[in-house]
């Protein structure tokens, strides 16, 4: 039971990964928009469920987004949000 009380440390990879995540999100966003979907709703659906059916195959978006773990995508979104709002 003692092992359950310990805080786990989550390590972050270097900033090179951030650029890649940014490119993936923008590519997927554009593909969703071109297909007439609400990109935010679809990306959130994918991030929450892990179901790739939220992302179309258009422009290979489904394969592109699946190259990254969902936690990497969420991490980049949180970092970007906090950076933008802490500078205001």
Swiss-Prot record:
Pfam entry (one): IreB
Query: Which residue ranges traverse the bilayer?
Result: none
State the family it belongs to: Belongs to the UPF0297 family.
For this protein, the record's NCBIfam families field holds: PRK05473.1
Task: Write down what this protein is called.
Answer: UPF0297 protein Bcer98_3100
